[in-house]
């Protein structure tokens, strides 16, 4: 499985450039890895070279919809390893690690900021903006070449700030319950589509509708209180009623009743 999705991906999604590009050794790995990923239908997210286990090269990749399954990581590793062995971007031995972006993922493209609007983010600017380098708040979409952030706990100033995308040094999502729920939903959908493409799961019937996440995540209406049953009519043929009727016919007076 070396080319799982390339034929079904829109070219403009694959070719969208990253806003942040790594320098040095990581850039050399990126120059080799990115063409291979694009040919397979994946996008490069980030490359990190660390001293872990001697030397570890972590290549973070994703599908254009933001998902990345274990099978995807295995396919990328199988295709990329021999290419890196030939080009040899680094002289010493290293351990190659292919991974997904994760739930609290970095945001590296314009489409990332649009896709995760409404979620909590933390931003570190490469160039200070309004005298600050660090921002945290709700991502409120994209406006021109800037992102909108609704800052938390701001007093005596406008909580809304526009941050130029090309001045951002690092941006990532903050782990929340809402983000975890959305990530699980995306992962399950991607897994179903992969199994269907491999013939491991039957396709949905033609009349089946795909679930709308906005509707499924909407609060459910409160149940209406149960309707009280109508009161039973009082009996009119009891012994008391029959005695009263007899007295009425005889002209007797009911001494138990008041005036």
Swiss-Prot record:
<protein>
    <recommendedName>
        <fullName>Ribosome maturation factor RimP</fullName>
    </recommendedName>
</protein>
<comment type="function">
    <text>Required for maturation of 30S ribosomal subunits.</text>
</comment>
<comment type="similarity">
    <text>Belongs to the RimP family.</text>
</comment>
<keyword id="KW-0690">Ribosome biogenesis</keyword>
<feature type="compositionally biased region" description="Basic residues">
    <location>
        <begin position="239"/>
        <end position="248"/>
    </location>
</feature>
<dbReference type="InterPro" id="IPR036847">
    <property type="entry name" value="RimP_C_sf"/>
</dbReference>
<feature type="region of interest" description="Disordered">
    <location>
        <begin position="186"/>
        <end position="259"/>
    </location>
</feature>
<dbReference type="Pfam" id="PF02576">
    <property type="entry name" value="RimP_N"/>
</dbReference>
<dbReference type="InterPro" id="IPR028998">
    <property type="entry name" value="RimP_C"/>
</dbReference>
<dbReference type="GO" id="GO:0000028">
    <property type="term" value="P:ribosomal small subunit assembly"/>
</dbReference>
<dbReference type="InterPro" id="IPR035956">
    <property type="entry name" value="RimP_N_sf"/>
</dbReference>
<dbReference type="GO" id="GO:0005829">
    <property type="term" value="C:cytosol"/>
</dbReference>
<keyword id="KW-0963">Cytoplasm</keyword>
<dbReference type="GO" id="GO:0006412">
    <property type="term" value="P:translation"/>
</dbReference>
<dbReference type="InterPro" id="IPR003728">
    <property type="entry name" value="Ribosome_maturation_RimP"/>
</dbReference>
<feature type="compositionally biased region" description="Basic and acidic residues">
    <location>
        <begin position="186"/>
        <end position="195"/>
    </location>
</feature>
<dbReference type="InterPro" id="IPR028989">
    <property type="entry name" value="RimP_N"/>
</dbReference>
<dbReference type="Pfam" id="PF17384">
    <property type="entry name" value="DUF150_C"/>
</dbReference>
């Amino acid at each position: 499985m070396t080319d799982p999705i390339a034929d079904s991906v829109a070219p403009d999604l694959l070719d969208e450039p990253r806003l942040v590009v790594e320098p040095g050794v990581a850039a050399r790995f990126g120059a080799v890895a990115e063409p291979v990923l694009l040919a397979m239908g994946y996008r490069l997210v980030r490359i990190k070279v660390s001293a872990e286990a001697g030397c570890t090269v972590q290549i973070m990749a994703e599908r254009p919809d933001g998902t990345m399954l274990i099978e995807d990581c295995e396919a990328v590793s199988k295709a990329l390893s021999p290419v890196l062995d030939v080009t040899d971007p680094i002289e010493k031995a290293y351990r190659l690690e292919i991974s997904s972006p994760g739930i609290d993922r970095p945001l590296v493209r314009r489409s990332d900021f649009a896709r995760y609007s409404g979620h909590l983010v933390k931003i570190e600017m490469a160039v200070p903006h309004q005298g600050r380098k660090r921002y945290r708040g709700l991502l409120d979409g994209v406006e021109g070449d800037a992102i909108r952030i609704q800052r938390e706990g701001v007093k005596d100033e406008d909580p809304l700030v526009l941050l130029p995308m090309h001045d951002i040094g690092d941006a990532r999502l903050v782990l929340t319950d809402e983000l975890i729920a959305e990530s699980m939903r995306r992962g399950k959908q991607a897994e179903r589509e992969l199994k269907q493409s491999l013939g491991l799961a039957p396709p949905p019937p033609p009349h089946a509708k795909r679930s709308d996440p906005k509707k499924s995540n909407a609060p459910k209406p409160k149940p209406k209180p149960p309707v009280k049953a109508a009161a039973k009519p009082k009996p009119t043929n009891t012994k008391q009623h029959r005695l009263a009727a007899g007295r009425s016919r005889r002209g007797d007076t009911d001494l138990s009743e008041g005036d």
